[in-house]
């Protein structure tokens, strides 16, 4: 997140005309004679009337005001995070983190504002701990995400609809036994037998998932269409489908949204160190002046901070300098 290097040219505190004009002139000379960085005049105090008159006379804008030259979060190498929204599946979030070698993924809205945070640990915990057969409906999982997770195709029904009621189960028994445990609105993972598919439709399930790339008969598709039942075809076997399917839930269901520890790009590093030590997170979201999440930082970033570069003009002693000059 670093562009052309900036070097600040600053006069002393409570600046007079000499101090302000020296900063402006020296920055201008350096910008004209070198390509090594961008030289920016700054002031360490308010401009007096005499100085303002001189600047107005020559049509020169006053330097920006700066009170502290200490290292800020924006001086760190903020790690840019890939775009991720809360509708993404756990599987896609996991793959995105693996591909980008990150352990935390900020979730943003369309304006770039932070909505939540998910970590690899959150995904692993959800996948290992959740044995609830109603998980997919509780999380309001989209059929398109389910098909994507099991590398399948929605061959009947609305892929943009959501599974909102019922449990997920594997149905391998004969049709008579299936009547005892399949309920209305369930999602059923099945084999290749047409009579099983027809019984599931008779039970008015929400979705039928067929494995091993098996082609469903036209009769089954027609009846499913009449009852608005979704049919998904996957190349995987029923065991693999059952193992993968919980990875299709949206990350909004597991992401953290409360008490998130974030930092501003304007925060000083001296002020955030204790917060980082107290909160043993691997990464912390960074928010810019416009309220957008611009990436993350970690404790490791303290090892390679970019201290501000400063040129002091019209100074006689350190006490005249801007605050934290020793850290520049």
What are the functions of these language-model segments?
Residues 65-75, 138-144, 239-240:
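Short linear loop/turn motifs
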Residues 85-87, 153, 226:
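Short, highly charged low-complexity linear segments
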């Amino acid at each position: 997140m670093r562009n052309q290097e900036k070097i600040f040219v600053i006069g002393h505190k409570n600046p007079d005309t000499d101090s302000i004009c020296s900063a402006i002139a020296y920055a201008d000379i350096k910008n004209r004679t070198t390509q090594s960085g961008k030289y920016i005049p700054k002031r360490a105090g308010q401009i007096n009337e005499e100085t303002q008159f001189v600047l107005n006379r020559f049509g020169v804008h006053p330097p920006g005001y700066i009170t502290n030259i200490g290292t800020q979060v924006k001086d760190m190498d903020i790690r840019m995070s890939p775009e991720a929204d809360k509708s993404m599946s756990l599987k896609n979030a996991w793959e995105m983190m693996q591909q980008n070698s990150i352990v935390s993924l900020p979730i943003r809205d369309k304006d770039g504002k932070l909505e939540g945070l998910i970590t690899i640990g959150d995904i692993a915990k959800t996948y290992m701990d959740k044995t609830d057969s109603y998980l997919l409906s509780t999380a309001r999982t989209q059929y398109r995400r389910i098909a994507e997770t099991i590398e399948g195709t929605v061959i009947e029904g609305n892929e943009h609809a959501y599974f909102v009621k019922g449990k997920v189960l594997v149905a391998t028994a004969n049709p008579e036994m299936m009547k005892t445990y399949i309920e209305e609105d369930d999602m059923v993972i099945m084999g290749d037998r047409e009579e099983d598919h027809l019984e599931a439709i008779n039970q008015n399930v929400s979705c039928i998932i067929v494995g091993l790339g098996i082609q469903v008969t036209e009769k089954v598709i027609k009846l499913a269409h009449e009852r608005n039942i979704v049919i998904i075809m996957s190349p995987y076997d029923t065991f693999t489908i059952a193992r993968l399917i919980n990875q299709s839930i949206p990350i909004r269901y597991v992401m953290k949204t409360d008490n998130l520890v974030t930092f501003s790009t304007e925060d000083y590093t001296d002020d955030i160190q204790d917060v980082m030590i107290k909160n043993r997170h691997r990464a912390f979201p960074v928010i810019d002046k416009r309220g957008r999440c611009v990436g993350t930082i970690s404790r490791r970033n303290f090892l390679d901070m970019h201290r501000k570069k400063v040129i002091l003009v019209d100074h006689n002693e350190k006490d005249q300098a801007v605050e934290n000059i020793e850290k520049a």
